[in-house]
Amino acid sequence: HSIDEMERVFNRAKKIPRPVVIHVVTKKGKGYSPAENNPSVFHGVGPFNISDGIVEKFDNLSFTENFSNKIVEMAQADNKIVAVTAAMSKGTGLDAFSRKFKDRFFDVGIAEEHAVTFAGGISAGGLIPVVAIYSTFIQRSVDQIIEDIALQNRHVVIALDRAGAVPSDGETHQGIFDIALFRPVPNLSIISVAGKKDMDLCLEWAVNKAQGPVVIRWPKMACPSELEPFSAPVEPGKGVLLQTTDFAPSISSFGQGEDSWRKKVLLVCTGSVFSETLRAARALVLDGIDADIYSLRFIKPFDEKYFAGIAKLYYGIVFIEDGVKIGGISEWIESFVRSSPETSFLKTAVLAFPDRFVANGNRDQILDEAGLSSEKIVNAAKELMRI
């Protein structure tokens, strides 16, 4: 804005003895030409080069970029796939889709509630809508997801970007409530992906095999290096188990001695914090503690029998969830573990976002403050094992 002009207008308004409406037209990026010319790029500002306005990118393929590539690939093979967003085509990675399939792309503007209901109608007409929205903004659509999607059991895929810790976007944009909000909703499947291959397989399942609505969530970060177990086929309710030998074969003491299970801890994580969990597991193995990882993949449904069969082989479980603890999946699984005869002996600990809003910061700062950094995971596991 022009500050001088606004001051003149406000001074005039003070002198008018009746109600006044001042229409202030915002020029996004005013005074900085790269921002004025690319307002969508500078909607959420991370590190960038001041001289030319070029925004820093992740060194590796990001989750958003992978989604962008995969949804275009799938749409080329199936003309029933359409994409819906709410004024965030670039941020969610749908800009490539919008250029490739102009007649199958719908930007409804800043109206997330309408985006969801609109997608339900599209689904009723026989198409497969993929709705891409940030986790924080999907909170506006809770009623529509319940009434217009889940209650009708519509085959709608909701792609939640910026799930979990969201760096640089402030406390209003954290994606920490979606699991607690949507886990109780009947008919709704929820998936949390851990990397590129995991996302690809889960998107294919959600679009091609799911019979009802599916929420798939991923973080604002680069995709971590893949490990072979994530190539496992998608089975509803089941996650991906990574044993110590999968990620630390040269230093593993897995299986040594008849009583070795008593040294073992299982780290159960949602996909968005797999990287931190993996670093913690490797650190624990270096300290002589066998630590396996169970990436949940499915938040809902959850195969209790399958999980109990895995969990009973361990001494303790640490849950790592990039969502609020109250109402989260970790809290529920911990309750199940304690009440099941097969697993009631297990020691457990839950690491999740506490009951307070999240301050602005980078990803490492946010996770450390919430107790979800790799160092905090290691400490929790050692405390559980009394080491």
Regions found by a protein language model. Name each.
Residues 1-44, 51-99, 113-116, 138, ...:
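Thiamine diphosphate
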Residues 81-84, 104-107, 125-136, 156-159:
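A short, small-residue-rich loop immediately preceding and capping a beta-strand
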Residues 93, 105, 112-132, 141-145, ...:
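Extended, hydrophobic alpha-helical segments in both membrane/secreted and soluble proteins
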Residues 106, 189-191, 292, 349:
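Structural signal for short hydrophobic segments within the conserved structured cores
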Residues 192-209:
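Conserved glycine-bearing catalytic or ligand-binding loops at nucleotide- and phosphate-handling centers
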Residues 249-261:
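A cross-taxon signal for low-complexity, glycine/charged-rich
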